[in-house]
A protein has these predicted regions:
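Conserved SAM/SAH-binding beta-strand->alpha-helix loop
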Residues: 69
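Charged, low-complexity C-terminal accessory regions
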Residues: 158-247
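Conserved class I S-adenosyl-L-methionine
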Residues: 37-49
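A short glycine-rich, Lys/Arg-flanked "PGG" loop and its adjoining helix->strand segment in the class I
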Residues: 106-108, 128-149
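Conserved SAM-binding loop of SAM-dependent methyltransferases across substrates and taxa
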Residues: 47-60
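A short SAM/SAH-binding and catalytic strip from SAM-dependent methyltransferases
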Residues: 111-130
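Class I SAM-dependent methyltransferase Rossmann-like catalytic core
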Residues: 1-38
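S-adenosyl-L-methionine
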Residues: 79-108
Length: 247
């Protein structure tokens, strides 16, 4: 299965809506606190909008989506198109890469706030090396310095005890992005770890080696960061981070 999309991914998302409800509720609660200044929204990595509440999207006058997955645009319209039409929200869906030509995409949408929808944590799977993935993430965040933007993304993921990841009582916590994070050891050496991981891993009984998605320092210092548990599969969980950067 393609980690970043594909028909099997959408089938899994549709099939596991009940199990993912806690994570979706956590994202909704985060977005309820976000009050974008812009009336336009650019969603990069939109997929079918499985975890973004349509009521929040209805607050915009125009929404533009990008995703490399050819199924994303038609399924996004299928899931959200009717209600967005009811709120008179203009919807434009594009199939293609918006990250490589990010500066050009931003210039084409000068008034839009930007939401990276569960894509930054996937870049480690799309680059030949971890160093190249980390460099791409850093380049993306530099491009956003003059733009209102937010992201929900994988921070870490890994195996959990049977039955723990299926709980709807998803772990939720809010913190502030520090200047730096303390180091710990994973399968590829010293990386950064937020202190909230200790509480998260205890609640979900994390097991084995967890994967670092290279996103620990995505947000500028002082950004409120929401930590959300995502029970991706019965024995595998993701720790999501969500934050919004205002101008």
């Amino acid at each position: 299965m393609n980690r970043t999309g594909g028909l099997l991914w959408h089938w899994r998302a549709w099939q596991r809506q009940a199990e993912w409800k806690g994570a979706c509720d956590g994202i909704s609660q985060w977005l309820d606190q976000v009050q974008p200044a812009s009336q336009e929204l650019l969603i990069i990595g939109a997929s079918a909008g499985w975890m973004v509440p349509v009521r929040w999207l209805q607050g915009f006058e125009k929404i533009t989506t990008f995703d490399i997955d050819r199924w994303a645009a038609p399924l996004f319209r299928w899931r959200h198109g009717r209600l967005l039409q009811a709120s008179k929200t203009q919807l434009l869906c594009h199939t293609g890469d918006a990250l490589t030509p990010l500066d050009a995409v931003l210039r084409a949408n000068p008034k839009a706030a930007v939401l990276f929808d569960n894509i930054l944590g996937q870049l480690r799977f799309q680059q030949p090396s971890l160093a190249q993935a980390a460099a791409q993430i850093e380049k993306i965040t530099r491009s956003m310095r003059t733009r209102e933007w937010g992201s929900v993304h994988d921070a870490y993921s890994g195996p959990v005890s049977p039955g723990k990841s299926a709980s709807r009582a998803a772990y939720g916590h809010q913190s502030v992005q520090p200047a730096y994070l303390s180091a710990f050891e994973t399968d590829h050496g010293a990386v950064s770890l937020a202190p909230e991981f200790t509480e998260f891993s205890a609640q979900f009984k994390a097991q084995g080696v967890w994967l670092d998605h290279l996103t620990s320092n995505v947000f500028p210092r002082g950004t409120p960061v929401h930590h959300i548990a995502w029970p991706y599969a019965p024995r595998y969980s993701h720790w999501l981070q969500a934050g919004w950067v205002a101008l």
